[in-house]
Amino acid sequence: GGEVLKTFGANTVLLAGADVLPSLASGAIDATEWIGPAADLGKGLHQAAQYYYNPGWHEPATILDCSIDMFEWEKLDDATRELITVASKAVNMEVLSFFQAVNDSSYQKLINEHGVQMRQLPDDVMNALGQRAGEVCSSIAAEDPVSQELFSHIVEFRSSILRWTNTSEKEYMRVRSLPFTYPSA
């Protein structure tokens, strides 16, 4: 996201987590991107920022990475590799599920208890960011053949998955938003 914002003239800085709130409060930085409502509330970012912009255009969700040097990975036996793979998937799913469960109550708390004003980025801004993100990623990918191959797979998969997403998740969320009600328990 930072590389994309730079192309629009933003000055981006990478800070240690402990330095984000003080830098925001002092005006050393004008804005920050952290994780999501629950983590943002826990970090106290509302103490220094009264506006909260959605959606997060640069990352679809909170995801954990587990990076292991390929040469070291290949030295591990199959059982250890499987253990690491299964444990990594389980932790990632647990963290994703946790944040999905607590983000709405944190979002409401930011609004109702701390007076944070929620704003939605307009479609023309989202389109410009998305277009520029593609250009930045393409430029970075062009620097070496491995990156280019990975990027082409990502673009191909994105095209494919968007067809299914429009039929499945997007429609599911549309239906969930219909005004039907459930009887009280």
Predicted regions located by residue number:
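N-terminal secretory/targeting leader peptides
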Residues: G1-A185
